Amino acid sequence: HAKLIVSLDCGIRSVEMVQLAQSFGIDFIICDHHRPGEELPPAVAILDPKQKNCPYPYKELSGCGVGFKLLQALCMRAGYSSDVLFEEIDLLAISICSDIVPITGENRVFTYYGIQKLNQAPRPGIQAIIDVSGLKKAIDVNSIVFTIGPRINAAGRIDHAFAAVDLLLASNKLDAANFAGTINDHNLVRREFDETITGEALTMIQNSVHVDTACSTVLYKNDWHKGVIGIVASRCIEHYHRPTIILTKSNGKVAGSARSVPDYDLYEAIDKCSDLLIQFGGHKYAAGLTMEEKNIDAFRIKFEEVVSASIRKEQLIPMISIDLDLPLNQISTQFYNIVRQMGPFGPQNMQPIFVSRNVYDDGTARILKDKHLKLNIRQEDSVTYSAIGWQMHSFFDRIHKKEPFDICYTLEENEFNGKKSIQLLIRDIQFVKDRNPQI
């Protein structure tokens, strides 16, 4: 008996679906932030800052951010206080961080106040996720992106998103803990799928005859789990830095998830291959697509042609942009607090990356869990700083032999046994012997 459907984070290209709803006398309001196609759906209202001639000044709202704006306008029109709406700003912050949209403008303001609420008065469902995940430190953008967001998303990836809705709506600790336990189990399954499929995908790339020359990656396996192929695409880019599309069988068709490298417009590239697709949608750095199985090879060839003709060579090389050459003796609590004021950090407002040169370990270097690097580093005239590098165990032998090296890193606050200290989060290491003399 529904008379109105409101879409959130989708619908901008769903022309036929909205037409079908119309035929049943159902109105549609679309809240989306993806790029529209040439034809807009015949909805009674379309809220999308990326549609042509949209006067709204800020174009980078998340999908939930657009929905938040609809509710904000509704409060204004109906004379309701917006205080009730802003009670949900913690959920808006989670959406902004999880959607990987720029942390600029309104997004930065919403994220700042949303994170404040997450830390000061988390709702039962969020507190339950914090508890079940073992998260100890204050919540920030990274906590949302890597701990809270993936668990909420895991419900829909592995089973059904209703489980996440139940969690976020839970009004007491007991219900929240039960829902969080279920969602955490889904996340463990998601991780297993992620690791297995990523391993298979990387092996396929390694065995490809074009592994060293290709400008793109398009992989297909009919039994890959659709819920993790976007994550797998991102993992592949970490190893092979080029636009990547992972495809799998879904409902008799082939569905895909695409991810890009910095500054390359993936959406435009896919659009040029749209004659081989049933449908697609997304934005510059991420997209989804559907095609017939018979078109996979033709799509792979055409997509590679499009990318190789439009991507710059430097975009295929992972780069780390250094913000400041920083001697270790200039790092202090005061300096860290000044840096922290620039947050919340995220896309287009990334945490400053520093480089300190000619450093060495104090002899306590060790490997954690067979893959992570834990150091205590110093320069000749500095105190010693704790540093950690995820997945950087390959540097251990040379560091252990006291070879001096340059290190680029971000700063973070580490808490152990109730004591807070500044820790260096390593982004990359270059040994002094390996320096390029031209740099």
Regions found by a protein language model. Name each.
Residues 1-4, 9, 24-25, 75-298, ...:
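Hydrophobic helix-and-loop "lid/oligomerization" segment in the mid-to-C-terminal part
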Residues 3, 44, 406:
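Conserved acidic residues
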Residues 14-15, 99:
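Intrinsically disordered, low-complexity regulatory tails of plant transcription factors
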Residues 15-24, 33-34, 41, 230-233:
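Short Gly/Thr/Asp-enriched flexible loops that form oxyanion-binding sites at enzyme active sites
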